[in-house]
Amino acid sequence: MKRPIERLPAATSSATRAFALATSLLYACAAPAASWTASWQASPQPVWAEDFLFPSNVPAELHDQTVRQLARISLGGTRVRIVLANTYGKRPIRIGRATLAKPGSERAAVATGSLHDVTFGGRRTATIAPGATLLSDPVAMPVTALSQVLVSLYLPAATPMETFHWDGRQTGWIVVGEQTQSHALQLDAADSQSTSARLLLTGILVETETATRTLVTLGDSITDGASASLDRNSRWPDFLAERLAPHGVAVVNAGISGARLLSDGMGASALARLDRDVLAQPGASSMVVMLGINDIAWPGTAFARNAAPPTLEALIAGYRQLIERAHNRGIRVVGATLTPFEGALPGTPLSDYYHPAKEALRRQVNEWIRHAGAFDAVIDFDAALRDPEQPSRLAARYDSGDHLHPSDEGNRAMAAAVDLDVLLDEVPDGTPAEPRADSATK
């Protein structure tokens, strides 16, 4: 809470008053401390076996190859750091060299004069231990909000791909040899590859001249952007970042396709990854939670044929744990209702994803999210996307075609539905506000 202005007693000596005045002027004139803030994120997942329902779309191993990845940051800064992860690896990963640059006009090309070496403890080479992350040294490369950066990583030794982010919604490139310094890659070479997954790169931090805030979106494939257009930055957190950038607020996406609240899915459960993906993010002050539809719909499908469906009480207990743990770290928690899914995933091995009993549980969950007062605010994505004539279905104009994931227009509508005044309503000292029934939906 804000502290009241403290006045010196009238009997205070003139010397004491002079000292107090000098001290206050010193603090008033001091330059604000620089602050490191998360500006981009891709949550790590374990690479699954070849017999899994979906292909991983990444090589089993890289050796003497360079990976170049493009990422759009949400907030700018004066310097940049990258975060690499070997979260699920069983062996150390050697980084032979890394560079950071701004993209040129051609695909995978570096803008002239923008190439910077990335170092780790002052060295160009580094090793990521199994289960560990690696934070780079600061790179003096000023970047602006919503701009793109190119990260190139050279892997000189045989490197099994055991950690990735499956659905990056952005093309990356893999070429033979040490090409981190190359301004243009030979993408038409027979041994070059492309992937839409994120490899090793899990975070980008920026240094700002004043303290800033980061909003983390914790979710599943709807947040991760399944069905969003490739290379368009058209996930709902991307559109929300465009709205929040003028307010100096970063948005980082902690969505994982196939994620669940209570149990592991195509990645760790939200309860298991909260510390890593949200609480540990520099500058994190708020998070939006949109999770639960896979918990409800997976049982009885090819993903979890014999699993029992969760109870409403179990889901509520999971949400409350997320809220309590975030509040314990001074992070505000905004709940988002679950969007309609009748008819989801037709013609796929998951065509039994929808069932009327599952729909009934979704509606119960949404009523609790809206009215329980457990969250600091609520975003009603269900109301924003549902067909008013058939509320168990997505409105046709927002449906990507699989009746589960929103289209680009649907993602834009989700971001537009958010009331920024309520979303950003925080107590000045970072203490979470008392739970309130206000909606963060327009």
Task: Annotate each PLM feature.
Residues 2-19:
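Bacterial N-terminal signal peptides that target proteins for export
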Residues 32-218, 228-231, 426-442:
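N-terminal secretory targeting modules
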Residues 40, 63-70, 92, 98-104, ...:
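Conserved SGNH/GDSL esterase-like catalytic core that processes O-acyl groups on lipids
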Residues 271, 297-299, 339-442:
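Catalytic His-Asp segment of secreted/periplasmic serine-dependent ester chemistry enzymes
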Residues 319-327:
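Surface-exposed amphipathic alpha-helices with a cationic face
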